[in-house]
């Protein structure tokens, strides 16, 4: 798969798949360009199709400065390369999302669980999904 560069201003409304647009992957600092891995989009579309509900992306591509400002963010986060997304789905648990993601990435990729339970500062839990070559799993 390929990592493609897009302009938030120019390509923001461009469809990457039936359910996802470029703007959904933009860094919260609104910097151009936005890097997005086409394989990540395919995985997220499969998750959307499986659960039949919208997938909310809370963090897609991140600039180095934005990543550095995030508490406990990995120094070489896959978000920096457009290969990661943090997602949640209304009415679907973190465990359900992660379990299905595991069927899509059984031997590689990153799947991180960030449950709401035990974290008063979180309005909902989320799952980190990335397309790295090695396999990595964690709970935070």
Name these PLM-found stretches.
Residues 36-43, 53, 66, 83, ...:
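Amphipathic alpha-helical interface surfaces
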Residues 26, 50-58, 91-96:
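A generic short-segment signal for beta-strand/edge and adjacent turn/coil regions
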Residues 7-12, 20, 65, 70, ...:
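Solvent-exposed, flexible loop/coil residues
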Residues 41-72:
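Extended, low-complexity, intrinsically disordered C-terminal regulatory tails
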Residues 1-50, 122, 132-140:
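Extracytoplasmic cell-surface/polysaccharide-interacting catalytic and binding patches
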Residues 28-30, 56-62, 101:
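N-terminal start-of-chain detector that recognizes signal peptides
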Residues 75-76, 80-140:
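Catalytic cores and adjacent binding grooves of peptidoglycan-active enzymes
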């Amino acid at each position: 798969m390929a990592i493609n560069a897009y302009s938030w201003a120019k390509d923001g409304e461009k469809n990457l798949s039936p359910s996802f647009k470029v703007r959904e992957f933009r860094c919260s600092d609104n910097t151009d360009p936005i890097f997005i891995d086409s394989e990540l989009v395919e995985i997220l579309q499969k998750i959307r199709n499986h659960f039949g509900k919208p997938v909310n992306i809370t963090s897609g591509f991140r600039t180095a400065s934005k990543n550095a400002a995030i508490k406990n963010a990995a120094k070489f986060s896959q978000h920096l390369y457009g290969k990661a997304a943090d997602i949640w789905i209304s009415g679907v648990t973190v465990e359900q999302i992660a379990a299905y993601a595991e069927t899509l990435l059984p031997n590689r990729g990153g799947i991180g669980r960030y449950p709401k339970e035990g974290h008063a500062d979180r309005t909902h839990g989320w799952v980190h999904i990335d397309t790295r070559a090695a396999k990595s799993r964690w709970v935070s």
